[in-house]
């Protein structure tokens, strides 16, 4: 396809998409931390570097991802950072807002985190703090929206700490419902241990 058409360049959203493409056309690759985070010298790391060090530009979604890429061996001069964009705020559907209000009835204060369930996102610290917070705020709730490798560990921790009434997990929900949860919450919690400006 590339050979037979007037393609000026290729933009890929994953390094694997470029791994087998043999062309002298300009190539740009988008990166996220999860997909490039392989120990230096491993076969996966070598494959990543073979692709990323042979493209025109590497677009990292954050400074954290850029620094991780450099640490993994990607040439710094090739990397630019473009943070993910956001959609304009839209008016929320009353039906979704009512559904969330029914789910959270009598729960207050309401904390929420929307992110992958990764170790570095640090959900467990919030969950552990709830053990003490529920003594002061018996109706407190922590809403976790997302999915990831740590999901089962977090659910196990919730059970061990007897916090099933205080922690709610949601995944594969619509944007409308997710935004309604955010709208009906009091505090958006970002407890990451990596990003310096976590709240």
Label every model-predicted segment.
Residues 12-17:
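Short His-centered aromatic/hydrophobic patch
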Residues 108, 144-145, 152-173, 187:
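Nucleotide-activated donor-binding/catalytic signature segment of Leloir-type glycosyltransferases, i.e.
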């Amino acid at each position: 396809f590339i050979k037979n058409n007037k393609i000026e360049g290729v933009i890929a959203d994953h390094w694997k998409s470029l791994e087998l493409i043999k062309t002298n056309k300009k190539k740009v690759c988008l990166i996220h931390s999860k997909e490039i985070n392989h120990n230096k010298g491993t076969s996966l790391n070598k494959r990543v570097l073979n692709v990323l060090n042979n493209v025109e530009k590497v677009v990292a979604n954050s400074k954290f991802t850029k620094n991780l890429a450099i640490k993994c061996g990607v040439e710094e001069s090739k990397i630019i950072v473009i943070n993910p964009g956001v959609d304009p705020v839209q008016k929320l559907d009353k039906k979704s807002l009512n559904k969330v209000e029914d789910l959270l009835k009598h729960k207050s204060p309401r904390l929420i985190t929307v992110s992958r369930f990764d170790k570095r996102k640090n959900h467990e610290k919030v969950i552990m703090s709830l053990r003490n917070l529920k003594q002061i705020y018996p109706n407190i709730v922590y809403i976790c929206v997302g999915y990831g490798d740590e999901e089962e560990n977090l659910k196990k921790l919730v059970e061990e700490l007897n916090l099933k009434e205080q922690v709610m997990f949601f995944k594969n929900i619509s944007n409308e419902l997710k935004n309604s949860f955010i709208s009906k919450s009091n505090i958006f919690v970002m407890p990451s241990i990596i990003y310096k400006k976590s709240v």
